A protein has these predicted regions:
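Solvent-exposed loop/turn elements at secondary-structure boundaries
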Residues: 167, 550-577, 581-738, 839-856, ...
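Hydrophobic, lipid-facing positions within transmembrane beta-strands of outer-membrane proteins
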Residues: 180, 211, 237-239, 289-293, ...
Length: 926
């Protein structure tokens, strides 16, 4: 069965099983509690009404059950008033209840005897502790997004969340043109999930952890970051970023936001010790700006709302230690334009629809190529990124059926088309050269890429809700395809060592690959309130099928035209993931909770894992190169063809029949306590263990085909055993995707968090201490050279982290705010490149090995403090807020990337934390 045919069948089955899409469950909140009379007895039959301007329908209602319990689900974030009424009793109204995303606010009430028209109104603080939910999350509402200085991007904002680590820290929006990976509590690089209003908008290509889209800050009402004990509707365990969009409203409102900086507004943080390491010029800002306009309101009050926003932002940065042919420092120049329109329709009282269209265009003048990773690039060897088509389209429906049934449905699509073309100034006949010792690329980009993809999400859920029990069942279907087409100058890559000819790669371009995937999930999530205990058991089933459709490639320099048959169902995973969360309201007062859980998650996967099995994929031979005339241009007569290794035509790969989907078990336990009226603290333990990790091995060359050879380890002054491949296996390739049971990774950590809101101030923050240790799983481990020192610190291990932010309203409408990011630097590797000059007769020609375990060396401590000062001017309903931001207040210059190859350039930085940056701007709102 083809993937396309399978997709249609799955969608049909999903439609029959449930009414509609489900990830939206992660977007919504709830209000729950118990109603009693003045003697303490429970009151059944009480009508409970939640009202908010955030609801286009205005109000949502429920009735207490025989235990006096009620629960109102599927509420949007906002400020609510809750009214309790029962004949023979005075009505009670609680006002000013702030409800963030994915939070259950416990609002209890006591009714006294009296006439119904007699009422008691109470204005009080919102609950700070969710005593029913077991999910760990942090919410950045619109006030925080506007107040705390960040790069106005979900990834930059996420760097303020306790426990979250990333490879490159953002300084004042200088890194928001890319999408860095976020990890939390030892999660995988793959396990980032992006949701728009609760609907997953993930790219099915690459590793599955990208969106292929850049987000408009003006669209966001708030952003929720869920990090542990996730429910069954969550696809994986890691950082779940849920972006809640504005819905418009019954009044017209809008904003204009402008901010920017240039190179004269940044401090010099190039120190002498960095210069001594060979860092001649630091990475720094050339110019950065952000313009964001929003407008929302009613088309028809209480019936149809609209919200639109346009954003144009740019970050042009000078690259560290990278120069043009004229000696000028190279610039990474880029900008993004985005326009979004959103409609919310209340068709009938119990049926709501939302329509969302978001178009984004990115241009990047000098992007590093996608094939070779190097610390230094001649700008002429970069690529130009241009966008042909990139948008998000989403339709969502939700319905309240009586007092106990809720249904939701959504469909999402994301096409991605962009080109990574050669730099226009590159010489016509130039070919790419890679110096493996200096870690530098020159001449021209190694290749040009044409990328295209289509993604679709269909999902649905039905919820049954009573006061003490709720059950949700649903389905999620994620399907699509991803394709890359490759071309190269001369179909060759020249490799040098410190400027001396070493070898060449003869490449089978024009080539490429296209893969398809269908990921289907069924889930059930239960929640039982049993006295002071709430149990949240869940079960998730997933089926993931990956295929390679039929495809072809034209003739190249070294290869003829080629046609390849389809390979259907290469991967066919069926997994079951149980999850159990709990929460104990210790004193039954909604202020103290002990919570935690045990959860199994599949690892998020993209179709990239079957690319090595695609016969059209890029492949090459590595051949010795003897540059006899010394011109550093490889002629055919200088290529020693008899000693080539590898293959120009990938042999048909295989998937081990026993291949398992990688998964993880997560263990959490934490104590949360509200102290006084305004402060909540928590302390928790987080554990994670990965299993069933896989890699692609060359089964044609087993580990027994290697002979040990002893060489000197230049770092330890001891011997190091490396392995020489049997010449009889030269050129033999049979890739097999296989699970290696001996591979594992695990994390253990503790975390303290504080969240305070006062009349004039707010503060949030956390301290995380943890260690992420295990095996790397990215190489052919049939080759024993890749097992050398393979166990060490993994991922973005950062032993100590401090994250936080604050805001304080000074007299005269002056707002002072800031944030802090302190962290241990990430672990480094030390790579020894073994060549024939070290081991004469080395069959592989070149072999990389780790001289020491990853983490024996590490990057330095990062200390980032950002501040913002805002003055508010008001005139009628309009506010003008000029803004002054200072990022990296202490001018930290911690190295974030450096040459890790042993040689003359070892330790030479290629990037550091950007220096102190001042940005000025302002906001007009009405």
């Amino acid at each position: 069965m083809t993937t396309s045919g399978f997709t249609h069948r799955i969608v049909l089955v999903a439609t029959l099983l449930t009414i509609a899409p489900a990830p939206s469950a992660l977007a919504q909140s709830a209000i729950a509690g118990v109603v009693r009379d003045s003697s303490g007895g429970v009151l059944p039959g009480v009508s409970v009404e939640a009202a908010s301007a955030a609801l286009i329908e205005g109000t949502r209602t429920a009735v207490t059950d025989t235990a006096g319990s009620y629960k109102i689900e599927n509420l949007r974030p906002g400020v609510y008033a809750v009214t309790f009424t029962l004949t023979g009793f005075r009505s009670v109204k609680r006002e000013g209840i702030g409800l963030p995303t994915s939070f259950t606010a416990t609002i209890n009430a006591e009714l006294s005897l009296g006439q119904l028209q007699e009422s008691v109104t109470v204005t009080g603080e919102s609950p700070l502790v969710d005593v029913r939910g077991s999910v760990s999350q942090s919410v950045m509402n619109r006030e925080r997004l506007d107040t705390i200085p960040t790069g106005k991007d979900p990834f930059a904002v996420g760097q303020l969340i306790a426990g979250v680590t990333t490879q490159t820290p953002d300084v004042g929006g200088t890194q928001v043109m890319q999408q860095p990976t976020l990890q939390v509590h030892g999660s995988s690089n793959n396990d980032n999930v992006f949701m728009l209003d609760g609907v997953q908008i993930q790219h099915i290509g690459f590793g599955g952890n990208q969106t292929g889209f850049y987000f408009n800050d003006g669209l966001m009402e708030e952003i929720g970051y869920q990090t542990s004990s996730l429910p069954a509707e969550a696809p994986v365990g890691g950082v779940q970023i849920n972006m809640i969009p504005h819905d418009g409203g019954n009044t017209y409102h809008g904003t204009v936001f402008i901010t920017g900086a240039n190179d004269r507004m940044q401090a010099d943080n190039l120190s002498q010790n960095l210069v001594d390491l060979g860092f001649r010029k630091q990475n720094r800002v050339q110019s950065v700006y952000d313009v964001n306009v929003t407008l929302g309101g009613p088309v028809r009050r209480d019936r149809l709302w609209f919200f639109g926003t346009f954003r144009r932002w740019s970050a042009n940065n000078f690259l560290g230690n990278t120069f043009t042919s004229t000696g000028e420092q190279a610039v990474d120049d880029q900008h993004i334009s985005d326009a979004t329109i959103r409609f919310t329709l209340q068709a009938k009282k119990n049926n709501k629809f939302s329509f969302h269209y978001d178009r984004s265009i990115k241009w990047r003048g000098h992007r590093p190529n996608n094939w070779l990773t190097a610390s230094l690039n001649d700008p002429i060897s970069d690529v130009v990124q241009t966008t042909q088509l990139n948008y998000i389209g989403e339709i969502k429906w939700s319905s309240t059926i009586g007092n106990r049934l809720l249904a939701e449905a959504a469909m999402f699509t994301l096409p991605v088309n962009y080109t990574l073309g050669f730099e226009p100034d590159a010489a016509g006949g130039a070919v790419a050269t890679f110096d493996q010792i200096r870690s530098a690329i020159s001449g021209v980009s190694p290749r040009m890429d044409t990328n295209s993809a289509r993604m679709f999400t269909y999902a649905g859920n039905v919820s049954y809700v009573t006061g003490s029990h709720s059950l949700k069942v649903g389905t999620q279907v994620r399907t699509g395809w991803s394709q890359e087409l490759f071309t190269m100058r001369g179909d060759i890559l020249q490799i040098t060592s410190n400027g001396v000819a070493n070898s060449v790669r003869l490449v089978n371009t024009p080539s490429g690959h296209k893969e398809e995937g269908v990921n289907t999930a069924l889930f059930a999530q239960d929640s039982w309130r049993l006295g002071r205990w709430t149990l949240n058991p869940g079960l998730r089933y997933e089926k993931y099928v990956m295929s390679i459709p039929a495809q072809s490639a034209p003739a190249g320099t070294w290869t003829p035209a080629r046609d390849f048959a389809a390979q259907n169902g290469i991967v066919n995973w069926n997994t079951v993931s149980p999850r159990l969360g709990f929460s104990w309201d210790v004193f039954d007062d909604g202020r103290t909770a002990v919570k935690g859980g045990v959860s199994r998650y599949d690892r998020l996967e993209g179709v990239a894992i079957i690319q090595p099995l695609n016969q059209r994929n890029i492949s090459f031979q590595t051949c010795p190169w003897s540059d006899t005339n010394g011109d550093l241009i490889a002629q055919n007569s200088e290529i020693v063809s008899a000693r080539c290794t590898g293959s120009l035509q990938p042999t048909l790969g295989n998937v081990d029949p026993g291949l398992k989907r990688p998964h993880q078990w997560e263990y959490t336990a934490l104590l949360q306590r509200q102290i006084g009226r305004f402060t909540a603290v928590s302390v928790g333990y987080y554990g994670r263990r990965f299993a069933d990790l896989y890699t692609t091995v060359n089964a044609a060359v087993p580990s027994t085909a290697y002979t040990p050879v002893t060489i000197a380890n230049p770092l330890t002054n001891q011997t190091l055993t490396i392995y020489n491949q049997d010449p009889a296996t030269r050129g033999a390739v049979r890739n097999v995707l296989t699970t290696l049971p001996e591979l594992e990774q695990h994390y253990n950590g503790v975390e303290l968090q504080v969240n305070t809101r006062l009349n004039r101030a707010t503060m949030f923050g956390g301290l995380t201490i943890g260690r992420d240790y295990g095996d790397q799983d990215s190489n052919d481990l049939n080759n024993p050279n890749f097992r050398i020192n393979n166990t060490g610190l993994v991922g973005f291990d950062s032993t100590y982290q401090v994250r936080g932010g604050f805001s304080y309203r000074l007299p005269a409408d002056v707002q002072f705010s800031g944030s802090i990011r302190e962290a241990t630097g990430l672990p480094q590797m030390r790579i020894l490149i073994v060549t024939t000059s070290i081991v004469p007769g080395l069959t592989q020609v070149t072999q990389n090995v780790q001289a020491v375990p990853r983490g024996d060396y590490g990057y330095p401590w990062q200390n980032l403090v950002d501040l913002r000062l805002v003055k508010v001017f008001k005139s009628g309903g309009t506010k003008f807020e000029p803004t002054l931001d200072v990022y990296n207040l202490f001018n930290n210059n911690a190295v974030t990337n450096a040459v890790t190859t042993i040689g003359s350039s070892l330790g030479r930085p290629s990037a550091i934390v950007m220096g102190t940056l001042v940005r000025v701007g302002g906001r007009i709102s009405f």
